[in-house]
């Protein structure tokens, strides 16, 4: 029986060339951000705890300054628009699964035709003195990682008996999802981990590469 392809595509460092949260805190946060980031990357604290604390360093009054900065700063990885079109033409289900925050993610993606693409990310609350992150897609009972935006929770909604589940990503926040996916399209840290853990994977530099990989996968799976 053929399976339906479903893609879980990361945002920071995958759709965009660089990690936008790091760019934002480097620009706007006091020096404490570096120690917090190191604790997240070394897994001493959860992503949810760390990202929440990072944004608590930032006054809510900076909202528009941050948006203006990151929309100008963010570079979309080549081939993304073509990748979205390819998924649409081929009937491949695409979800954007991001540990990023709605208030900067949505303006960056605004130029693209994503009306039919579900976007899962963290929320934001500017009603207090400092930015508070909200977690509408937190971990389910099967995950204890404190992901914030739990990619494995979303992946588990798709039955592997009927769906071929592909994670596209680059970093530590994609690793748990990659471990339960059927296939991984990876770069940077995630590519090294996929190799180390012997996960079925291909590597990519642009979304043109991703399209080529999907064409190969389709021949084998669909």
Curated annotation (Swiss-Prot):
GO molecular function: 2-hydroxy-3-keto-5-methylthiopentenyl-1-phosphate phosphatase activity
Pfam families linked: HAD
Keyword Cell membrane: no
Keywords from the UniProt entry: Amino-acid biosynthesis, Hydrolase, Methionine biosynthesis
Record has Membrane as a keyword: no
EC number(s) stated in the UniProt entry for this protein: 3.1.3.87
PANTHER family: PHOSPHORIC MONOESTER HYDROLASE, UPF0655 PROTEIN YCR015C
Identification of the protein by name: 2-hydroxy-3-keto-5-methylthiopentenyl-1-phosphate phosphatase
């Amino acid at each position: 029986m053929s399976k339906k392809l479903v893609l879980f595509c990361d945002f920071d460092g995958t759709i965009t060339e660089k990690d936008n949260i790091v760019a934002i805190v480097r620009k706007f946060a006091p020096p404490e951000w570096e120690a917090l980031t190191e604790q997240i990357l070394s897994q001493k604290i959860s992503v949810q705890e760390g990202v929440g604390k990072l944004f608590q360093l930032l006054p809510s009054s900076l909202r528009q300054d941050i948006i203006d900065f990151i929309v100008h700063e963010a570079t979309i990885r080549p081939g993304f628009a073509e990748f979205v079109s390819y998924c649409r033409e081929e009937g491949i289900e695409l979800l954007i699964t991001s540990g990023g925050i709605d208030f900067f993610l949505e303006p960056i993606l605004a130029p693209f035709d994503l009306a039919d693409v579900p976007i899962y990310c963290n929320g934001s609350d500017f009603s207090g003195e400092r930015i508070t992150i909200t977690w509408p897609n937190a971990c389910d009972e099967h995950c204890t990682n404190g992901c914030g935006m739990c990619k494995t929770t979303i992946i588990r909604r798709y039955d592997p008996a009927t769906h071929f589940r592909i994670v596209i990503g680059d970093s530590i926040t994609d690793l748990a999802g990659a471990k339960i996916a059927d296939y991984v399209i990876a770069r940077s840290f995630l590519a090294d981990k996929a190799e180390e853990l012997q996960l079925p994977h291909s590597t990519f530099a642009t979304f043109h590469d991703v399209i080529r990989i999907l064409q190969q996968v389709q021949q084998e799976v669909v």
